[in-house]
Amino acid sequence: MPTVSETSAPSRTSASYYLKLLICILFMFFFSKIVPSWGGITETGIAAIGIFIGLVLMIVLDFGLIPATLMAIFAVVMTGFYDGSAIIAQTIGNSTVVQLIFIFTICNSLIQTGAGEFLAKWMLSRKSIQGRPMLFLFVLLFVGWICGPFMGTGGLVLLYTIMDYIIATLGYEPGSDFNMTARIGLQTACMLGTAFLPFKGITLAIYASISGALEAAGIQTNYAYYMIFSFLIGVLYCLGFMLLMRFVFRVDISRLKTLDVSKMEVMQNLRITPQQTISIIFTALAILYTLIQLIIPEGSFKSWYNSITLWLWAALMLAILSLLRWNGKPVVNPEQLMGRVMWGVTLAVAAFTVVGGMLSNNDLGVRTWLGSVLSPIFGGMSFPVFVLVIVIVATVITNFFSNLATGLIIGSAVAPFCIEYCSNLGINGTFICLALVSSCMFAYLTMAACGPAPILLSQEPFVKKPGYIWSHGVPPLILGIILIWAL
């Protein structure tokens, strides 16, 4: 419902809205007509800079991902760098964009069938972890990490429901250190978990901001290595936070000895359905395609296997999953699954891939100019220091600013240097992508950090103690920075 102030001055709101929109359009379509070339950048290169600035501004100013990206794609065609047919191949026809659609769809089957929720409940209700405070706490945090890539905000809601049961059963106050610190741990673990799948949602958009430039320079990245090390970061973070909670914050967890989560009403009669089993199997098969590539020996079979590509394999898994029936009913509804695709993020990946390709194109001069400008900052850095700077800057900024915009801006800015490090030192660019994505997803200190941040910060204990998130949220942030950089 609109407030009085919103309804009393519509002209002022409209004027502000259209003024901002006009500025974005000027950047996208007229920047190269107004601003003369500099630093050896061609007119098309100047236009690419304007499109990038206009696209980021439209996203930051909340004009929406879909209109912003469609306008940017049209602006690219207007530069003459691509024609209408070529832009289709570079955007919607790009394998990265297509795989995002199918991977996102098949992963959503875990939500549609309830398989993701079952797995979370199953792990937390194991008898082996009941009455063992440290072990239970680790599993709770790890389940939070798993919820990130496979359940999203729905997983956080489930975990906070379990936390409500724990504090009520054990007599902890809502404002107790145990309750508030554990919730920070769950939120941060979940956010780190969202970085696990590099071919899904916002993660892919940020990943592609660097990988797109690397691939344009002939440098390939590897999803399998990415996921393996992202998993290690997640496990080590859960262990590290557990130790922080116990030995640094000195939170009393002794009451967990008497806790039995399996007695919760939502944990009763916990049985997996055939539909959930099938969904888990096919989602795992889709993801394992990339990991299997690491163990197949070189030869004709590996060449054939690689020719299938991840997007086509995921599409096949989705097709088979959609055809399967149980008791006369489909296991999943493919139309509903496809309807849940985040088209805004998908188009953002497409648009930034194209614009990023223009910015990194040697013939347009932007990459050379950007290198000369930033070389005093990055030029003399060793590779470890370079990555550390990226991790610190991205992690700090993303906690005050949109994590998607942060990742896209930083990724585009450092991509030319990533190319140099990879080309000259033989560095695997996958790990630079992992560092940036993990840093940008580690957002939770302020409401503006990311979409799920208000789920934590709007809870009553954090509203009553606004400083708590800083005193107990910054140390985990430092822990995350160290782990992301070290791995």
Feature names for model-found ranges:
Residues E43-A47, G93-V97, S125-V139, Y172-R183, ...:
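Membrane-interfacial loop-to-helix junctions in multi-pass transporters
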Residues V60-P67, S95-T96, C107-E117, I146-T161, ...:
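Short helix-coil transition sites and intra-membrane helix breaks within transmembrane domains
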Residues M1-Q99, Y225-S372, H472-W485:
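Hydrophobic transmembrane alpha-helices of multi-pass small-molecule transporters
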Residues A89-Q90, F118-S128, Y165-A168, Q336-G339, ...:
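Short amphipathic alpha-helical coupling elements at transmembrane boundaries
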Residues L170-E173, Y226-G234, L347-V355, L359, ...:
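C-terminal transmembrane helix pair
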Residues I25-M28, G50-V56, V139-W145, L186-A189, ...:
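Hydrophobic, membrane-inserted alpha-helices
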Residues S11-T13, Y165-T258, S262-T273, N428, ...:
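Membrane-core helix-loop-helix motifs of multi-pass transport proteins
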Residues L124-A217, N403-S439, F462:
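Hydrophobic transmembrane alpha-helices that form the pore/transport pathway of multi-pass ion
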